């Protein structure tokens, strides 16, 4: 159950922002294997003075169209899977909405089931971790 935080320069259209969000989600479904309905994303638009980055870090020329993506997800995936996810996100963003691969900056932050509460202050994912029990959330009373 990942959550993706996406930062980009203010002024992009709603369709552009949605295409970025869709590309990230579709890559997670395809490469990580999350269910299609497991979608939690935050898009933050920033003015140029609040989006600070090195335009040539490690020799990669970045433009004003940089997209910074931080994905928090449960740990344990192989290095190959993580690298494949980076590549697939960059490829999908290049395809639609046309983000240059040089402008795609991704960081994965891994954690544990105990770090997630998906509603009502409950942590049902811990049951899976602690007891191997199926994950379900009881109806609200």
Question: What residue spans do the PLM features occupy?
Answer:
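Interaction-mediating elements
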Residues: 1-141
């Amino acid at each position: 159950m990942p959550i993706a935080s996406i930062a980009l320069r203010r002024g992009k259209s709603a369709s552009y922002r949605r295409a970025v969000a869709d590309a990230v989600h579709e890559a997670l479904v395809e490469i990580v294997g999350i269910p299609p309905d497991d979608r939690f994303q935050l898009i933050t638009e920033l003015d140029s003075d609040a989006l600070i980055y090195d335009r040539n870090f490690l020799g990669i020329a970045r433009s004003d169209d940089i997209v910074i993506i931080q994905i928090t997800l449960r740990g344990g995936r192989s290095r190959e899977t993580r690298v494949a996810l980076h590549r697939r996100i960059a490829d999908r963003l290049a395809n639609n909405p046309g983000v240059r691969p040089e402008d795609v900056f991704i960081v994965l932050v891994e954690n544990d089931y105990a770090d997630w509460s998906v509603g009502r202050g409950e942590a049902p994912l811990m049951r899976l971790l602690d007891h191997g029990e199926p994950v379900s959330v009881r109806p609200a009373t």
